[in-house]
């Protein structure tokens, strides 16, 4: 809400151009109606920014790329993937590495991870979610060979950490030697911190697209700065009028 008020203030002050930098795009998971009588909140957020006076949006790792079409104007969709893969690639033995998607919907992202890390194998976890129960999923079978491997579970966000911790358990049940979690957005709501602390995950790697208070940090949590990525993008937009990132 504060950002919308700032945009409105700038518009009323006759700003020539307003670019909204929103590293975490709110309500991105509500990008369609799962059942009747539900809002499409991701579209509403885009409409609110446009109505307030925004000319351009800059976001990081949208839940689905199609959300870019909700905003009537340019959308710069940035990716934290190079930042995360660079960190992970320097930490692990790539010969024993497997990239794991927590569901079938993020397999393509896992493929991009694999490409940047030298073509390591991919696995995914078959997951069922009840749309009537928010933030709850039932983890099913691990599809792929993870025995003896260092598994990197990748996702766009960690909310309550239910999906992630169930995935970690499933991987260890299939013989994984080590599991590291990597995600862009650390929402960390509700029981997330307790679940992650109690899990067998070796490290949780996130970025600071959202502020992470000190009380939510723990020994196995690594927070990478998204500032260099945003800084380069902002410079290119205002100096070159296009993005090369």
Which residues does each PLM region occupy?
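PRPP-associated nucleotide enzymes
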Residues: 1-243
């Amino acid at each position: 809400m504060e950002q919308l008020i700032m945009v409105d203030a700038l518009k009323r002050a006759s700003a020539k151009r307003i670019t909204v930098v929103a590293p975490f795009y709110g309500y991105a998971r509500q990008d369609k109606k799962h059942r009747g009588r539900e809002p499409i909140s991701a579209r509403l957020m885009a409409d609110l920014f446009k109505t307030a006076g925004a000319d351009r949006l800059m976001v990081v790792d949208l839940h689905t790329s199609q959300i870019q079409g909700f905003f009537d104007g340019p959308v710069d969709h940035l990716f934290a993937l190079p930042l995360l893969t660079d960190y992970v690639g320097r930490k692990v033995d790539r010969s024993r590495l497997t990239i794991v998607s927590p569901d079938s919907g993020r397999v393509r992202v896992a493929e991009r991870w694999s490409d940047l890390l030298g073509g390591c194998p991919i696995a995914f976890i078959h997951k069922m979610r009840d749309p009537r129960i928010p933030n709850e999923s039932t983890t099913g079978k691990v599809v792929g060979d993870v025995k003896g491997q260092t598994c990197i579970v990748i996702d766009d966000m960690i909310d309550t950490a239910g999906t992630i911790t169930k995935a970690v358990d499933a991987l260890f049940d299939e013989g994984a030697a080590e599991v590291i979690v990597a995600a862009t957005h650390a929402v960390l709501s509700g029981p997330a911190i307790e679940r992650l602390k109690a899990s067998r995950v070796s490290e949780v790697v996130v970025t600071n697209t959202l502020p992470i208070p000190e009380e939510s940090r723990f020994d196995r949590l690594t927070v990478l700065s998204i500032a260099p990525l945003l800084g380069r993008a902002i410079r290119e937009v205002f100096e070159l009028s296009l993005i090369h990132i």
